[in-house]
Structure formats: structure tokens, C-alpha cells
């Protein structure tokens, strides 16, 4: 619906910009800004266009912020599905959860990686890493992969 589309952009893109503009005067040099984005920013999926677009926009904002404000440490965590209660709440049928639980990131493991990323001044965390590699390949020849493996791009209900 139109309302869901607006909410998706509001939650995933607009809210960060509003929050950042509010806290910007209080940030000190070398402050860390951590953005939780999605691997969906790198791929087109049926029934998830606005989610992917909002996350792609968010990743672009984080990358631009890193360039515009070099005194900040900006970390973009581009993630696949995470094993949280959100998965069950978003799809009461649990179809997505059951189909993809085996590849879901564990929150405790992810938190550790983000803390390590902060300590090491990383600019990106991409998890799961195999998905990131696959999506880089997708970016080289998207239409070919969409034709050869159409079900990979139609997993959202």
C-alpha cells in the first residue's frame, strides 16, 4: 500500500537523516556513526522494491557522510536476514523464517562484529560474507542471473 511504502522510506532512510541532523552539533571529532543497512541494497527483489531502494538510499547517505565529514568514523553494516523476533512478527506464517533460518545471522555474533568494526575503524561490514560475494557477482551481470535463477529474486511474499 501507499502507507507501507511511505513507512518503509521513513523508517529506513528519512528517520536517520532527521536524527543525524539533530545530533550533528553534539558529535565530536572521531565520533562513530553506525548504520544498519541491508544486502537488499545491492539486489532487486520482487515484492521488495521499496525496501531495497530505501536501504540503497541509506547506504548512499552513509557513504556520502563518510566523504563529507571525514572527521567521523562511519560504519555501514549491510546485512542479510538476522535471527530476531522481527522475522516472526513480519511474517506470521513463518514461511520466510523457515526457508531462510539456516542462513540467518545470530544477533550476538553480529554485535561482536560491529564492536570489532568500530575498534578497527572499518567502513563496512557485510554479512553473511558469502552473500556479499554473490551479490557482487550479481552486480556484474544482473539480467543474466535473473533469467538463469529467477527464484532467487522472488523470495519475498
Question: What name fits each language-model region?
Answer:
Residues 38:
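Residue(s) in the substrate-gating loop at a strand-loop-helix junction
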Residues 22-31:
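A short helix-coil junction within the Rossmann-fold of NAD(P)-dependent oxidoreductases
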Residues 45-49:
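Active-site loop immediately N-terminal to the catalytic Tyr-X3-Lys motif
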Residues 24, 57, 62-73:
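Catalytic Tyr-X3-Lys helix of short-chain dehydrogenase/reductase
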Amino acid at each position: 500500500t501507499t502507507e507501507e511504502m511511505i513507512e518503509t522510506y521513513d523508517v529506513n532512510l528519512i528517520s536517520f537523516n532527521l536524527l543525524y541532523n539533530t545530533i550533528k552539533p553534539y558529535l565530536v571529532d572521531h565520533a562513530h556513526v553506525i548504520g544498519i543497512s541491508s544486502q537488499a541494497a545491492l539486489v532487486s527483489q520482487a515484492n521488495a522494491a521499496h525496501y531495497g531502494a530505501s536501504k540503497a538510499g541509506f547506504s548512499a547517505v552513509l557513504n556520502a557522510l563518510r566523504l563529507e565529514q571525514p572527521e567521523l568514523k562511519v560504519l555501514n553494516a549491510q546485512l542479510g536476514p538476522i535471527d530476531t523476533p522481527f522475522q516472526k512478527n513480519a511474517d506470521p506464517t513463518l514461511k520466510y523464517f523457515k526457508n531462510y533460518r539456516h542462513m540467518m545471522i545470530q544477533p550476538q555474533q553480529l554485535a561482536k562484529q560491529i564492536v570489532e568494526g568500530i575498534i578497527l575503524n572499518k567502513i563496512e561490514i557485510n554479512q553473511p560474507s558469502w552473500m556479499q560475494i554473490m551479490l557482487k557477482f550479481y552486480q556484474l551481470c544482473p539480467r543474466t542471473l535473473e533469467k538463469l535463477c529467477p527464484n532467487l529474486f522472488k523470495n519475498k511474499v
